[in-house]
Amino acid sequence: MKKLLVVLAFAPVLASAQVPSSPSLGIAEGRCRAGEPGSAFLINVVGLKDRGGTMKAELYPANDNDFLADDNILINAGKTFRRVVIDVPSSGNVQLCIRAPSAGTYGLSLLHDRDGNRKFGLSIDGVGFGSNPQSLGPFKPKIAVGRVTAGAGVTPVNVRMLYRRGLMSFGPIK
């Protein structure tokens, strides 16, 4: 009975500690700032299908359980999650800078949200990962396709975008 009372007493505190869901989760932590020291990735996006919509980069812990996991769950567990979103420029190179907590290995994913609805559209949108896989099947990718290693400063990485090809596979545009 005492344990139940203790749990009930702390329930409001525990509930208030949860981070509410929002598209802005991880953005403040992920944004690069001019002259700021620390680890970051400068992502050069290649192989875009078109210049519409937005480009979203997300950084995850480097393990299969946390890679592409729900941002709320990661943040509430105190795990790495960073996000950067930009409008795709009408011309020129498409680059995003995303900060990492420190030098080390992470999982990196990109979404070309061509219709700008902030959701992945299987038949419309493109995806990219840090290790540049040649193709993707219909299943959730493992960390091996997204693994990148940050140095102490800014680490450049090229990411090739993949778009739906055929019924359930993704590959680069031709």
PLM features per residue range, with description:
Residues 19-33, 136-167:
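Extracellular beta-sheet/turn segments enriched in Thr/Pro/Gly and aliphatic residues
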Residues 56-60, 107-109:
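Beta-strand signatures of extracellular beta-sandwich domains
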Residues 46-50, 101-103:
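Short solvent-exposed strand-capping/beta-turn motif centered on an Asx-Ser/Thr pair
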Residues 41-47, 57:
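A short, amphipathic beta-strand motif
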Residues 4-13:
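Sec-dependent N-terminal signal peptides
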Residues 94, 101-110:
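A short tyrosine-centered beta-strand micro-motif
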Residues 113-122:
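Acidic, glycine-anchored loop motifs typical of Ca2+
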Residues 71-100:
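Tryptophan-paired
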